[in-house]
Each structure stands twice: as C-alpha cells, then as structure tokens.
Amino acid sequence: MSSTQNIRIGVFVPTFNRPELLRSCVLQLLAQTRRPDIICVHQNGEGDNYAWCVADLHAPVVWMHTPARIPQNDWYRTPLNHLIQEDCTHFFWMDHDDIYLANHIETCIGELDIGYDFRISKHCGVLISRSPAFQYHPHARFDDIHATGGMSASMAFTLPFARALSTDLGNPEFNHVFADEVLARHTMPRFRCLHSTQKTTVYLSHASSLSSAHWVREDTTFHEFRSDA
C-alpha cells in the first residue's frame, strides 16, 4: 500500500487514573508530522471520567469509559475493535505515559509500507522521573524486558494483523498476564514482523508505573538494558 494513498491511521490509548499524562499523550499525537485520523482512548478502572482533560484540544478523540475493572486484554481489545470498525488501515499501540517524537507515526508507516505487517523498536530513550530530579538515558535496548522483543509502546501494525490480534485477545485460552504477551506469543509468529532500529520513543518510568516503578525507587544504572554504544 502506498504511504500517501488510502491510509487511515488509528491510535488506541489505554489510560488509568492519570489525566495529566493522557493529555500530554494526545498533545504529542497532534504534533506528529503525520497526524492520526482517530484517537481511541479507553479509560479503564474505577473513578470519575476524565474526558475533560482533552475536550478543549479539538483532537479526533473517541472516548470510552469503563467504570469498573475489566480483564486486562479487553482494555486493549475494546478500542482496537472500534478502530477496525472505523476502517483504519494502520494501527498504533500507545501508552499514555510514554514520549513520542514528532516523526513516530510517519516513521512507522514508512517501515510497514515496505512489506511488513507489524513493527516494533527495541531502541529507545528511557526517562526515570523522580521528584525533584530525573535521569535520562538516550540509548537503551529492550531485548528481554518485554515479550515482544522491543518497547511495546512503539508497536504499529496493519489491518490483517489488527484483526488477528483482536481474535487472539478474545481467546479465553490466551490468559497471559499482559496483552503484549498474547501479541508476542500468538499473533506475531504468523506475520511478517520488523524489529526496527529507529528511535522515535522514550520510555517513562514513574512512581505509578505498573511495570517500571522500581526504577524510580532504585539508584539504577540500567543493568536491565544494553547500551547502543
């Protein structure tokens, strides 16, 4: 598929209890060199609906609010299905608490359009945010941290992959702890996948992070990562 014709870009962003991070994520999407056509935000969990945090941005946001906790895989599958129904051709899996450089979407589409169904990058920056200080590591590699073999929030894929992923996420036999494990173990092996060397993302570790809050509490030297150098 040509990168300039018949493209409809859909982004799904799960969010929980962090309206300030979600607003930042949507602002980053609006700053992309290739803006998405639809941003499907899924607020999952207890608490008040915070759609107000992006209401003034005039962004193409579809807001879904699930007032009670649901299975982890449905947190991703629900907005993914909406984007499929909206006839999207290119899909982006984004987390509300990561940083996306302005060329992220454009870079991913360029890589998918050379013949891949799925792309992910193991190269990224890492920001450890601890008040009142922070650590920034511009060169890190996600080799074994995530099941996908890269930074999960850097994933992008085509419609055939999206349909297969939706089916896999809805399979009760694939009851892994995290949705990206389902993707890595069951969906990726059936498609043409690219492990990109492009760095268009920064992974954010903060006190509320489910997967990396321990970095905030530790005096880390990033033994979990390999340097690009």
PLM segments and residue spans:
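Acidic donor-binding/catalytic loop of UDP-sugar-dependent glycosyltransferases
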Residues: 98-111
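Short, acidic, metal-binding catalytic loop of nucleotide-sugar glycosyltransferases
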Residues: 27-36
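Acidic donor-binding loop at a coil-to-helix junction in glycosyltransferase catalytic cores
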Residues: 174-183
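N-proximal low-complexity "stem/linker" segments adjacent to membrane-targeting elements
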Residues: 1-27
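Short beta-strand-to-loop acidic/aromatic patch adjacent to the donor-nucleotide binding site
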Residues: 88-97
